Amino acid sequence: MRRTFSVAVYPRHQGKVLMIRHKRLGIWLPPGGELMPGETPLEAAARELREETGLEGRFPVVSDIDGTPAGLIGYEEHVAGSKGIHMNFVFVADVDTDAVQPNDEFEEWRWVDSFDDIGGPPNVAQLGRLAVTARPRFNDVSG
């Protein structure tokens, strides 16, 4: 089975995180996508955030573990249909505005502070709750 590295980014602004309704899948997810050759997960997270939403993010250092990329709040794996298994690095990024410029992957979006009615895979809500509460340990890294 094919394996692909991917990223998900929970952008947050004024205590809420951005969720998009994925056109093809029909479920609420954070922005994200696959890593390009030679890209680090953090570079991919910043690129996907910018490409999908028009937002620029600052990725706070949220882990005390030396060598952990800024903004990394988790890792999960899921089957992505014909794309095989996505090995997914999950990030949080602070953004200065809630003005989203959607791309062709979604038309609906919303800023949420509760994940009780978000639906979709349980880990989307679990990671979303973590993104809302993750606190910086040191300096932010711009994406």
What are the functions of these language-model segments?
Residues 31, 37, 78, 140-143:
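Functional cleft and adjacent loop/helix regions within the main domain
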Residues 1-17, 90:
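Conserved N-terminal beta-strand and adjoining loop/helix that marks the start
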Residues 88-92, 99-134:
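NUDIX/MutT-family hydrolases
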Residues 28, 84, 110:
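Residues that recognize and position ribonucleotide moieties
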Residues 54-98:
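Active-site segment of metal-dependent pyrophosphate-handling enzymes
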Residues 12-51, 55-58:
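Conserved Nudix-box catalytic region and its N-terminal flanking loop in Nudix hydrolases
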Residues 69, 74-81, 120-123, 130-131, ...:
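Class I (Rossmann-like) S-adenosyl-L-methionine-dependent methyltransferase catalytic domain
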Residues 23-25, 66-67, 107-110:
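Short, solvent-exposed aromatic-acidic interface loops
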